[in-house]
Amino acid sequence: MKLHELKAAEGSRKVRNRVGRGTSSGNGKTSGRGQKGQKSRSGGGVRLGFEGGQTPLFRRMPKRGFSNINTKEYALVNLDQLNVFEDGTEVTPVVLKEAGIVRAEKSGVKILGNGELTKKLTVKAAKFSKSAEAAITAKGGSIEVI
């Protein structure tokens, strides 16, 4: 037996079903689309949420709430993420972005108190949670609101 004589095992390679190739193929004429109607046509079909002309559920439900255009969205950083820095480092939003901890600054950076801080750092951010503030100062570090 040579390399060019190798064949796939019987039944291991299934032949793709080609529709619309004659009635004797089993999938000719209507190509598995049933009889006439919107769904049988080329490009036919109904949009997402369409209920046959009946007022759809999303329009029957009342509107609720609103989006406040003045909402400030902060980039959130937890304490355990700050352990990548050396002792005595001044951590600013720019430094956090360079380190890959923060992608976009948004309305500024907020430091949260999840995890444990093991380094003494000077942290500058727009906001601090009370637990984060306490943890940073407990390690001998300092905080500055910018």
From Swiss-Prot:
GO cellular component: cytosolic large ribosomal subunit
Entry-linked SUPFAM superfamilies: Ribosomal proteins L15p and L18e
A single GO BP: translation
InterPro entries: Ribosomal_uL15 (IPR030878), Ribosomal_uL15/eL18 (IPR021131), Ribosomal_uL15/eL18_sf (IPR036227), Ribosomal_uL15_bac-type (IPR005749), Ribosomal_uL15_CS (IPR001196)
Annotated Gly residues bias: 23-35, 42-52
UniProt cross-references to Pfam families, sorted A to Z: Ribosomal_L27A (PF00828)
Ranges of compositional bias, category Basic and acidic residues: 1-13
Keywords (A to Z) from UniProt: Ribonucleoprotein, Ribosomal protein, RNA-binding, rRNA-binding
Tagged with keyword Kinase: no
Gene Ontology molecular function terms on file: rRNA binding; structural constituent of ribosome
Stretch list, region Disordered: 1-61
Family: Belongs to the universal ribosomal protein uL15 family.
Assembly mode: Part of the 50S ribosomal subunit.
Reported function: Binds to the 23S rRNA.
NCBIfam families noted in UniProt: rplO_bact (TIGR01071)
Protein name in the entry: Large ribosomal subunit protein uL15
Upper classification of the organism: Bacteria, Bacillati, Bacillota, Bacilli, Lactobacillales
